[in-house]
Amino acid sequence: MELYPGYLEDHFNIHKLSISSASPPEYMTSASTQFAAPVRMGAYDRPPPVGMWSHEQFKVDNGQATSASTIMEAEMKFENRLEEIPQVVLEEGRNVDQEASKPPDKVLRRLAQNREAARKSRLRKKAYIQQLETSRLKLAQLEQELQRARQQAVYANGSLREPNLGFTGPIDPGALGFEIKYSHWVDEQNRNTGELRNALLQGQTTDQDLELKLLVEAGLDNYNRLFEMKEEAANSDVFYIMSGMWKTPTERFFLWIGGFRPSEVLKNLRPQLEPLTDKQVVEVGGLQQTSMQVEDALSQGMDKLKQTIADSLTAADPFDSPEAYMVHMANAVEQLRSLVQFVTQADHLRQQTLQEMHRILTTRQAARGLLALGDYFQRFRALSSLWAARPRDSGIS
């Protein structure tokens, strides 16, 4: 085909050929068109000028294509980054909240160390208490063995056929257990007495009356525990309770059936309860009279029991057979079991007296009464200590 002159300079024909061509021009298949295709022109964007009469306008520079592809690639990465920002922010916020809700590792380690130290402290305290109780048991056992050795020395001129004279058998475990419990009870009573004294010195207010009420109830509960311990120990060794070996010498001097006389306590502590109303005076007087009557009845019962046991021992003929002798001794042993009931009834009288005084008196009066009672027993123990520490003549062992 013959081309007319200037055909190659006819830019319009070149443009027509490029438009009508079935395949896109070479510059349209470059890598830049793959990224330029999604680009859309905004409604208010000014279209780029296109020169139609200069072939330079259709000439694509490789550098420009590369830069355009780089720009489009950066824009797509930027859009992808924008889409990822909310999720990252949410995840970071969620992680921050979770971290804030969790204590730091240093705090957790410190808490674990504190728990371990507290556990070891409790174990040491428990071991110390067990060691203390064991030592107290050994001390009580040595004291009882010493007392029985003294009794054996007193009766050393007795029959050689009775080497155990002065001994009543092995030490009862129940008595030793009561010795430890009673020592703890004394500590608790001293603490309650001190708290009552401090509370009474602070004056009278609504809060103070409530505190006094709680202290009075705690003091009464402490005495109730003592009576329960004594009943349990009496079933194991009633003579241990009745003899007062668990008390100081001065307390044993005033002992009545293993404890204090309720009527004597009421008489000695009544001045500490003043002022009393007329009704309270009548009720306290009636309670004291009733206590004296029950005490007399129990004392008479004890005297009768002693006489009955003595009669059982003297009823046996020295020339009777061993079988007849054992029958009389068995009767005497059975009668001794009644001593447990006497101890229980005496403690019941003491308990009822304290409860009736609590009912008759006001909270403040009951607090003063328990304070006076605790101080009363403390002075007995202090008197025994002073007596034991008194100066002795060097010529007397």
Swiss-Prot record:
GO terms for biological process: defense response; DNA-templated transcription. Keywords: DNA-binding, Nucleus, Plant defense, Transcription, Transcription regulation. GO terms for cellular component: nucleus. It is found in: Nucleus. It comes from the Eukaryota. Residues 132-146 are annotated as: Leucine-zipper. Residues 175-390 form the DOG1 domain. InterPro entries: bZIP, bZIP_sf, TGA_domain. PANTHER family: TRANSCRIPTION FACTOR TGA4 (PTHR45693:SF36), TRANSCRIPTION FACTOR TGA9 (PTHR45693). Belongs to the bZIP family. This is Transcription factor TGAL6. It comes from Oryza sativa subsp. japonica. The gene is TGAL6.
